């Protein structure tokens, strides 16, 4: 992502992911968001980053993902000297692809060196990425208690399964934004398709997570959705580093 001649502001929606981002000479780790926020890129500035899919953040970070919920931290503050050295190397690269390759290599190594990745949470996160999934059924399906499931989600994702379910459902709505704008489908039908109890439920979640009504959100996002991502579940984003795990974000 590059800034225009004037400062470029972009609204960031919660998506269940943790990002490693290089911007303005700083290497930042953006924790999992629970509400939308605005990111600005100065004129002529660039942002390069990688997105970690829901469920692997805790392993890559080396600490509970919940500690970075709704927060941005310098890599040195999370990874110490390793984070500082990575920031220096990325800063020495002169092109975007070189920086992206360094970030991808670093995340792949941290994932390989991690003691373990919580495969149960990964499986649960994938299930929540599709319409028709029910949080209430996850514990029984995975053979653990509700309390254990919540704890493991907080460690690996950054918040509980209900919050992730709400966020992924919002992402599915965003993918339907073109249909909302063209009025090919009404909001009540879309809400039902995506697993909302009714249109009012969709409206409440949109306001809670973004501060916008469903229609306003659709208008704001319709022209920002890549055609290849429309109608696809959030966990179906293009993968750059390793299957199912780390996806590119620019």
Report each predicted region and the residues it spans:
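Alpha-helical bundle regulatory/interaction domains
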Residues: 1-146, 156-161, 175-197, 213-250
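DNA major-groove recognition helix of helix-turn-helix
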Residues: 153, 165, 205-207, 218
């Amino acid at each position: 992502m590059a800034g225009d001649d004037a400062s470029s502001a972009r609204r960031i929606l919660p998506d269940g992911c943790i990002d490693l981002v290089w911007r303005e000479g700083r290497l930042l780790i953006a924790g999992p968001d629970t509400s939308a926020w605005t990111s600005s890129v100065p004129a002529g500035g660039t942002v390069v980053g990688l997105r970690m899919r829901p469920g692997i953040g805790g392993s890559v970070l080396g600490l509970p993902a919940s500690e970075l919920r709704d927060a941005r931290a310098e890599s040195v503050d999370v990874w110490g000297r390793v984070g500082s050295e990575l920031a220096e190397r990325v800063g020495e690269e002169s092109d975007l692809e070189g920086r992206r390759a360094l970030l991808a290599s670093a995340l792949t190594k941290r994932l390989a060196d991690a003691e373990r990745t919580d495969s149960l949470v990964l499986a649960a996160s994938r299930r929540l990425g599709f319409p028709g999934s029910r949080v209430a059924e996850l514990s029984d399906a995975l053979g653990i208690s509700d309390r254990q499931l919540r704890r493991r989600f907080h460690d690996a994702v950054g918040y509980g399964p209900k919050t992730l379910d709400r966020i992924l459902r919002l992402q599915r709505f965003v993918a339907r934004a073109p249909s909302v704008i063209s009025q090919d489908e009404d909001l009540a039908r879309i809400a039902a398709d995506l697993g909302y109890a009714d249109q009012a439920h969709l409206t409440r979640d949109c306001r809670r997570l973004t501060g916008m009504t469903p229609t306003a959100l659709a208008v704001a996002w319709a022209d920002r959705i890549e055609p290849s991502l429309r109608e696809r579940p959030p966990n179906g984003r293009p993968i750059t580093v390793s299957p199912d795990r780390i996806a590119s974000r620019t």
